[in-house]
Structures are given as C-alpha cells and as structure tokens.
Amino acid sequence: DANKTYTKLQTVGDRLTPVVRMEIEKMIFENQMIVVAYVPELPKNQKPCYITQKGRYEGAFIRSGDGDRRLSPYEVDRLAEGAFQPHYDIEPVAAASIDDLNKNTLTAIIRRARDIFPRVFATLPDETILIQLGVLTKVDDRICPTLSGLLVAGIFPQRFFPRLEVVFTVYPGVSKTGNEKTGVRYLDSKEIVGSIPDMLVETLTMVQMRMNTGAVLEGALRKDVPDYPLIAVREAVANALQHRDYSPDGRGTHVEVNMYSDRLEITNPGGLFGSTTIESLGKEGISSSRNEYLSRLLTYTPFESGYVVENKGTGFMVIESSLAQALMPPPKIQNSLTFFKLTFEKRRRTMIEMSNRSWEVIDEAIIAELTSRGSCSIKELMAMSGLSRATMTSHIRKLVRTGKVEPTENARSPKQRYRVVRNDHD
C-alpha cells in the first residue's frame, strides 16, 4: 500500500540520531503507485547515523549486497573521527624514554626547525623544541617520547608497538593462496621494522630487489625500465606510514606491501580521512591529515637527500605523474572505513621485448644513434644496446654492405668507428 508506506517513511527519520529528513514523494510507474524516497548523505562530522533506541555501537548499519550489516565498533569510531581532529599521534609512550630515540635524528630535526622558524626556535633549548614539535611530552613531571617521536626517531619502536611495522611479501601467483601445483604460498616474506625512515628505506630496497628491470629501445638504443617506478612506490609507502590509523584499535595492524605476479599492492589500516575523497586525490586544494603532528615531523626528518615527506598534499600527484611517465595506468584505489589500498599494475612487456628486438628495429636504432653521436665504436654500441659483440658486428656489417654506414678507419684499425654515410647532396 503506497499510502501506508508513505506515512511510515515520514516518521522513520525521527527515530535516528541525528534526525534524517528524507525527500518522499508518490508517483505512477507502469500504472502502479510507488513511493520514492531520497536520503541525503550526512556530513562527515555528523556520522555515523544510528537507531537512537539501540545506541551508536548497536544501531549503526551499512548496506552490503542485498542486506544490511552492523558496523563494527572500529568502523563506528573511525566514522566518529570525522567530527574532531584525532591526536593519537602525540599520545605519550610512558614506557619509553629519550634514550630510545636516535640522537642524530633528533639533532637533524632541531636543526631543521631552527632553519625554518628561526624567530621561534633560535634561542630555545633543544628539549623545549622537541616538546613544542611533539617529539617529547611530559607525564607526571617526567619527559618521554610521544608516539610520533618514537615513529620518526625511534631506534626500535616495535619494542613498544610490535605491529607498527611493514610486512613485505612476494607471492608466486595472483593471490595469497600461492601456487596450488607446487604448494608454495610465497616466495619471500619479511617483517620490516625500525623508524618510519628506516622502514621506508628497507621496503624500497626489497621492492627493487624482487621486481624485474627490463631494457627497451627508445629512439636510439636502450633504456632500463623497472616493473614499478620507484618514485611511485616510495610515495605510496610513505603515505601509508604517514596517514595510517594509529588509534589504539589500529595499532595491532601492520602496513602490507604485497608483490604478486601481475601487480604491487600497498595497504594501510584506516581509510581516507576528513575532507579527502578518492575523487580529490591528486587534485589541487585543501588536504586533510589524520596524523597532523606526525605529518609535520616527517617534513623535518631527514631521508636520503631531503626529507621523508613534503606534507603539501602532492604525494598522489607524484604517483600519478611517475606512472604516466612510465606509460603505465594510474593506480587502482580501494578505500573503506577499515583500510586504504593502492594497486600498481605490473609493467607490461613492450612489443620490442616480446619480439626480442626485431632485426630491422635494431638497425634503425643503430642508425639513429650514429646520426646523433656522429660516430661510435662497436664497444660503445654494445654498451648502449646490451647486445653481444657478435650480434652488433653482424648488424654493422650488414649496414656497411647496404651502403648505410661506413667505417672511419682501415679495416683492422684499433681506433675503428662507424658513421652514417652522407648523401652527395647533403
């Protein structure tokens, strides 16, 4: 009965917290009266919506398939964070002391802070600066590290939080079930520990060791191309460690970096935070940070020739740009209340690689290189192409025989080089 349904729907929203005002109307569809209700999405700072009588943890549901699923307490808490700025990243780690922090890293952070904000920090004592930045805090008149301080400068943070680590795994197939024929579940697995800079370095090293690097012809002879651009991987792993969920419930879950035969996945606990959406990733505008103190500290924390992050909301732009430059598709994004995942497709072999470089393509590349450089020796052409001496010599002899290339010296000269034959009217 459309009229009864219409009447009942008008009061449903009153039984929810916050109260939901639906747009309800009756209309004719295929000669039948139906009721259409539009339920506007609540702002993030008002979620989750729940049945008032059942309470927040028992009365909040999410649509799943053809049914409804009650949200877990973890999911409810993550939604509730939309109403405030979490400060889990500066909670004190009372069991730790300043002796658990790397002195060189602390010195670098202090120096960086004084360089950026000399009027604020130039005359302050080192300890005061570390407190102001959220590296240290006071608990009952005792100085101890914060969670952020431990993460950026800790010698071994996993002593206090064993699961705040990266687990890197290489699987032989396209799923975690492994190879059913051989029974091999994974080819390599490693727990990566230490501070965020330490984990980032080791994770990148493991990815580089386990992925393939191909050589393709580009214009003139050879260009090395990895399965995954390391710049993109670095940004993805850094973002996972920077923006993951560090709430007490989230500290039992690690960051996963999984390499399959066809893709690389980077997964962190906790979905996108605040105003950030999948659609806004990689776009210019205001960005949100779940861990604002940690994010700022990472801009002061040394890493290779710079710092761990820029904290300017450009990380995803760098990922997309580096993949585009490698002629690879954008990353696949999966986002939920409980996790965020980026998937990079493995670089597909080029036509040249699959055909093992056709004879004609190599000839064209040699001519292009000789034209560009003026002349080259056999040894130089071998180094640029990766081809053997016998193969390169065969190509050069053919090009000489067909009148496209000529030697610059006598046949047996140790200084022999080759150049493109000039036309008489050039």
Model-derived features with residue positions:
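Conserved N-terminal catalytic/coupling substructures associated with nucleotide/phosphate chemistry
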Residues: 1-232, 238-352, 368-371, 375-380, ...
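Short helix-coil-helix linker/hinge
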Residues: 357-365, 375
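Short, cationic-aromatic polyanion-contact patches
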Residues: 360, 407-426
